[in-house]
Structure formats: structure tokens, C-alpha cells
Amino acid sequence: MHGRGQAHPKMLVGSLAWKVRLEQFFTNVAAVSAHTKTHAALMAEHGMNTYQGIMGFYEGWAMASSDEVEKGIALMQRSLALLEAKNVASHRPHFLSLLAQVQVREGDFQSALALCANALERARRTEQYYFDAEIYRIEGEARRAAGHPLTDVEQSLVRALEVSREQGARMFELRAAIALARLWRDQGRKAEARDLLAPIYGWFTEGFATIDLKSAKSLLAELST
């Protein structure tokens, strides 16, 4: 009985960690915030520190994605440092890309680009390639926001599209296509943008309440006028 009693909170923590990853994937900020608070309460109640760095990072991401940007960025950075100190290599390319995305929103484009370069290098070193498409997409958006040549922006976004297709990562493909379609729209290439995005959006049969699919639908409507 004692062993099962000890295992129970660990199982809850593991379940919360997976829920947080899923909710963050779909940019559900409120859900991520709620799950990380539940995790913190469990840690305090049972004197545990399981997933401390990982869940701390997600908590920081939720804060930075709402109205506590500076505190959120600081917590994301502290959590990354904690994971580095513990030599935890998993998640790092993904986390670096998420921090880069926050920095793009805050206008710190050079930091964002440096984080993307670091994320790609870490992915190569640790053979964690599953977020490469997202890293290239964020790199492209950082380049565009920073005023880099549009050929460089397009190169990053096309690479994001290629990688997502190679990996069969449909949601990442959709995100890359949205970013590239917006670029082409602003260049007056509306027909090309629509032809790129429409079949990718058409592949989906569910999830239409998610931010990504709503964005794709809205953009397609604009491109069709």
C-alpha cells in the first residue's frame, strides 16, 4: 500500500507533464497555466521536484504568452539553466524555439535568431530533429520581422515546409504554409499563396477550433477575395 501511495503523485505528475505538452502544442495558454499550477501544488504537497525544470519552463511560457512577459521570459531562462545544469538534453531544441518565438513577439529579433541557431545546433548534436520545422519557421518569422532580405525569409519558410513534409508533421506543415502564404500575399502572389495553403488546410477533418486552423481559414478567405 505504501508503495502505491508513493507512486500515485508521481503518476499524476507524469500525466500533467503530457497534458502540458499537448496543450502548449495547440497554444492553449490558460490550460498550460492551470496544469503547471496543479503541478506546483503537488510538488509542494509531496516534497518532490519531478519535472521541475520542464514544468517551470512551460509555466514561464504561459506567463510570457499572457500579461507577465518579463517574468515569464525570466522563468523560461532560469528553467533552461536548471535543465542545462542537470544535463537534461531532451526538450532543449523545442524550448529554445519557444523562447525564440517569445523574443520575436517582444521585438528582440537578434536574440530570437541566435536562439534558433542554437536550437538547430542542439538538434543536430542530440539527434532531436522533430521540431526542426518549427525552428526554421520561427527563424523565418524572426528574419522577416527584423527586416532581412525577403529571399532569406522565404528560404527559412520553404525549409520549414520541406522538413515538415519529410517528417509527415501535418500541423507543422500547416504553420509553415500559413507563414509562407502571408509572405507571398504581401508580395502580391495571392494565387500562389492560396494554391499552397488550400490543399494543406483541406487535409484536416477535425481541430477546427484550434488557433492554427482558424488562422488558415481566415487567411484562405482573404486570399479568395
What are the functions of these language-model segments?
Residues M1-T225:
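Helix-coil-helix junctions within alpha-helical repeat/solenoid scaffolds
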